[in-house]
Amino acid sequence: MSVRRLTVCIVGAGPRGLSVLERFCAHERKSASHPAVTVHVVDPARPGAGRVWRTGQPRQLLMNTVASQVTVFTDGSVDMAGPVEAGPSLHEWARELAALTPVEELLGGHDDATLAEARALGADSYPTRAFYGCYLEEMFRRVVCGAPAHLEVRVHRSTAVSLADETPGSGGAQSLLLADGTRLAGLDAVVLALGHVRAEEPGAPDPRAAALGLAHFPPANPADLDLSGIAPGTPVLLRGLGLNFFDHMALFTLGRGGAFSRRPHGLRYHPSGLEPRLYAGSRRGVPYHARGENEKGVDGRHTPLLLTPERIAELTGRHREGPGLSFLRTLWPLIAREVECVYYGTLLASRGRAAERDAFVTAYLAGGDDTDRGGVLERFGIGPADRWCWERTASPHPRHGFTGPDGHRRWLLEHLAQDVRRARAGNVSDPHKAALDVLRDLRNEIRLVVDHGGLDGLSHRDDLDGWYTGLNAFLSIGPPASRIEEMAALIEAGVLDVVGPGLEVDIDEADAAFVARSPLVPGRPVRAHVLIEARLPVTDLRRTADPLLRDLLRSGQCRSYRIPAGRAPEGYETGGLEVTRRPYRLVDALGRAHPRRFAFGVPTEAVHWVTAAGARPGVNSVTLGDADAIAHAVASLTPAAAPRLPAYEDPGVRCPSDDRLTEVTA
């Protein structure tokens, strides 16, 4: 008697690749669907952390999620077919490290910085990215160690460059070529969990820049850029005031030996003398809002008032029976009312009137228009100065502008101080931060409506991609409050200046400099010799630098996702990697779903919304549910053309020795 071996390949060994591996092991342990299984894991970076979360990156770079709300493992809240298998969250793992004896610390192999961070990390602290990478690497080892006895894992520290059916067009066994010359043949399933992939290098913003000796750095992860050649005192312009900006800010200051000290009203910066002279700006002219201090514990979240399961079912049913929805007409009014209700309810509670909250919400939601809702506000004693204003929240600067740089600087420092005060009050207690946290809490509900073409293509392009996604990021996924404090201290120390709203950048050929100005801040424009695009590159399959995705697109084995649009026959081509609904099979140029290829995560942005969000315990994490769906589909496959092996007798689950995890070199 002989049996077949199932051979699987996961391309990408970051958090999503790890989640698929963990879920696949869980399915196989519960019920060994195949007598023998090999899982190849392909990534040039160390498995678990991958490139983005690598452990060697500077310790100045922080996550923007608290430690207790980060995990690799499933729980009872996750809607999935597979078994729940417990494992530590990031904070729970930190507690494990903190409890180690000195001998255990030596045996564990973790460096002093990791152990020190573990001892200091609280449930609501923001970990360094390097520490998260250490967690991911350790969880990868645990998953492999806990794998069922019939499953082996082989790690290939290389880059996948091409994928093909061994028999063209058959949908059978797959062959994957790696950059080191290795060819993985006879693959029964391939899962693409590529994460953030590099984009093609764009040219300089103006052909004059290179000729004038100006340095322009395109959008990228700051940890991937070598900026060591920028000399102290060099004027540097950062275009963007989001999370990427704060990374650059930290690397140019803390990363160059500067330090902050606490004083009664904020921080003071102590320069090292190695900093460049920093200038920054953006369209809004203010940084992302600070995250409110977490008061929701591990899994607390806003319970939807309007975006209920019944309303979501009604909206998705309308889409399936007809054209895509309009975001502005159908979803935005619901989101806006949810946020406003939480703001006003928290405002009443902060005034000692919590008992009136339910009555207010009922009356406010019953209001048919702005006039009706205004009457409700008057009845509950909420005056004009305390009323929620979306325009002011999205663009907080004065409409009339400023008298000059000094006036703008004073206004900005007060804006930053107010943001810190609100953040310190918490994401439940402070009316503004509680309201903005609703946007984060509603992401799953919004995804259920907009994913897989739920919106009309033009509404997806103009309203979701072109407006709401940016607004959502600005208001709800900002940095810790400590970063806003640091920014203010750098402004006060003369290390950083913010140009102002409506940033405009040009080149002065006579002066060989980038020139930046704000139309709302009169005065002498800023001049810089270095321009850094302080943002990540846009996810776009058509402009990716990833060799595997480029090859799949060139050969017609994948395609860019296109959303039908009522007023545009050609629809909206998004640049996202097209996949089916769960379990996310890859779709080729002719619209055919491949039975043995799966993809999820960042490259599928636009098919799915906000794909960069991580897995959180206790809230039915979409990421964990997606990983389980893919793992279940892979485990259900029949081997295509794997070599035959002797019949296998399962000795039961055991903890495999180190030789079960094999690192393969060419």
Curated annotation (Swiss-Prot):
Pfam families: NAD_binding_9. Residues 656-666 have a biased composition (Basic and acidic residues). Pathway: Antibiotic biosynthesis. GO terms for biological process: antibiotic biosynthetic process. Its EC number is 1.14.13.248. It catalyses: L-aspartate + 3 NADPH + 3 O2 + 2 H(+) = 2-nitrobutanedioate + 3 NADP(+) + 4 H2O. Residues 645-666 are annotated as: Disordered. InterPro entries: FAD/NAD-bd_sf (IPR036188), HpyO/CreE_NAD-binding (IPR038732), L-asp_N-monooxygenase_NS-form (IPR052189). Its cofactor is FAD. Keywords: Antibiotic biosynthesis, Monooxygenase, NADP, Oxidoreductase. GO terms for molecular function: monooxygenase activity. PANTHER family: BLR0577 PROTEIN (PTHR40254:SF1). Belongs to the nitrosuccinic acid synthase family. Part of a gene cluster involved in the biosynthesis of cremeomycin, a light-sensitive o-diazoquinone with antibacterial and antiproliferative effects. Catalyzes the iterative oxidation of L-aspartic acid to nitrosuccinic acid (2-nitrobutanedioate) via N-hydroxyaspartic acid and nitrososuccinic acid. This is L-aspartate N-monooxygenase (nitrosuccinate-forming).
